[in-house]
């Protein structure tokens, strides 16, 4: 497609789900957009299997962009991304994985990519509601255009994945990027615990500080000395998650 795209193109863009008849078009587009070769079964799945959210952006009847994502339980996250969510979230907590997001070159920078991403968020809020806690994806470390797109929309780098991709027989590095939603968050680091403690102390009234410090110190002592016979009526019980 080589026509000049008007600045008002977004107002003429329509959205619809991909279907089996789109396979040839989607193959051609993915060949232009991505260096990875997908098997025919992948194209059949994303255009027919209801577990995928496969949305096309069309302009005057032609597909000019698409997003493919899967909403799944956190237990189905692959090992390399297993720590996307803190272990405190239940096993039926859901995540959304973006398999593909692309826009025809002439239509880039017209808001179509953002429209597709926002449509995925709307779909999540309708189907998964607040049970979905994160949206994540993988990207080549050299794909600065995509990285800037996601970072400008509040996605944050979570993992560096050496040799994650095999492109025409050459191994390439990747990143995992994550957007947390509905209160989702990664496992806490030591810095997070320190910041949480500082916030809690800032909210204490002066008169309660000595007693609370004693209780926290007692709890800490017991965690290091489980054989200790020290006891207190006001002791704190807590569990630690990793």
UniProtKB/Swiss-Prot annotation:
It is a peripheral membrane protein. The gene is Naa60. It comes from Mus musculus (Mouse). The active site is at 97, 138. Its main location: Golgi. The modification N6-acetyllysine is found at residues 79, 105, 109, 121. This is N-alpha-acetyltransferase 60. Disulfide bonds: none annotated. Residues 1-192, 237-242 are cytoplasmic. Its EC number is 2.3.1.259, 2.3.1.48. Acetyl-CoA binds at residues 101-103, 109-114, 143, 150-153.
């Amino acid at each position: 497609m080589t026509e000049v795209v008007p600045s008002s193109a977004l107002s003429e863009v329509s959205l619809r789900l991909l279907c089996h008849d789109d396979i040839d078009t989607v193959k051609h587009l993915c060949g232009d957009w991505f260096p990875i070769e997908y098997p025919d079964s992948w194209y059949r799945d994303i255009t027919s299997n209801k577990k995928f959210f496969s949305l096309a952006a069309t302009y005057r009847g032609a597909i000019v962009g698409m997003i493919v994502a899967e909403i799944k339980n956190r237990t189905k996250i692959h090992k390399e991304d297993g720590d996307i969510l803190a272990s405190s979230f239940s096993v039926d907590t859901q995540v959304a994985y973006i398999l593909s997001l692309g826009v025809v070159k002439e239509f880039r920078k017209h808001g179509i990519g953002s429209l597709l991403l926002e449509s995925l968020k709307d779909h999540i809020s309708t189907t998964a509601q607040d049970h979905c806690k994160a949206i994540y994806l993988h990207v080549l470390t050299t794909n600065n255009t995509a990285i800037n797109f996601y970072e400008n929309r509040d996605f944050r780098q979570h993992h560096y994945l050496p040799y994650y991709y095999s492109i025409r027989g050459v191994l390439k590095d990747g990143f995992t990027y994550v957007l947390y939603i509905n209160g989702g968050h990664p496992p806490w680091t030591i810095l997070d615990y320190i910041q949480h403690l500082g916030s809690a102390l800032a909210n204490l009234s002066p008169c309660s500080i000595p007693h609370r410090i004693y209780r926290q110190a007692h709890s800490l002592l017991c965690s290091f000395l489980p054989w200790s016979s020290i006891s207190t009526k006001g002791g704190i019980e807590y569990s630690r998650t990793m």
